[in-house]
Amino acid sequence: MTLPNKLTVSRFALTAAFLWAMFSRSPVNDTLALVFFCLAGVTDYLDGKIARQRKLITNFGILMDPLADKIMTCSAFIALIERHVLTPPPVLHLGELSLSPKVHAWMVVIIVARELAITGLRLLAASKNVVLAAERYGKHKTISQMVAIIALLVMDASAEWWPWLKAALLPWGPWFVLLALWVTLLLTTSSGALYLWRNRKLYLQDV
């Protein structure tokens, strides 16, 4: 197994470690969750970079790298729903609509549905001996998801070790989280729609 593929596989293990930390009763569980998720993000950056530099791109990596990303980010969003049961104070009011820096269930439904649709398309392509690689705008989507998740984790972990940081984040931290979540939602839906449109011949010919 090549080094990039080992890094990709390690992301599955780091995702499991992240979920354990999220739901453990350790006094530093938020910090551990943040560390594990950041390490998983580093492997996502390194596996692609090393594969391109050393010309170690394989069909395994093309398929499993985006799958590892999807499992990592979707697991994190679902876990954050479980953790953030109480809605924080809203930071923006639009008439009767109040927006809070929280991962809502309907957001995760959209994100997971998009990822399942793209995974289904890749499986359909594989059945036709076609390998669909991740595209640049898909990577931008993944980065935006990671930024939103890390922002939420930092807000939680700061209460364990850095009370001064939590106090410093209060004026603008919730605004950043809210913006990151909505940017993530926009990139997730738009990139998914564009990917399905560009590869429409794969599924339209079977309709």
Where are these regions (language model features)?
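C-terminal membrane-associated helical module and adjoining short loops/tails
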Residues: 1-5, 14-15, 34-37, 41, ...
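Membrane-embedded alpha-helical segments that form the functional core of polytopic membrane enzymes
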Residues: 16-63, 74-84, 95-112, 172-189
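Core segments of transmembrane alpha-helices
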Residues: 10-17, 68-80, 114-119, 141-153
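Hydrophobic alpha-helical transmembrane segments of integral membrane proteins
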Residues: 1, 12, 62-65
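Intrinsically disordered, low-complexity domain-flanking/linker segments in eukaryotic proteins
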Residues: 87-99, 164-169
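Hydrophobic alpha-helical interface/terminus motif in multipass membrane transporters
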Residues: 51, 77-81, 121-125, 196-199
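Juxtamembrane "helix exit" motif at the C-terminal ends of alpha-helical transmembrane segments
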Residues: 81-89, 157-159
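Cytoplasmic juxtamembrane interface segments
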Residues: 11, 109-132
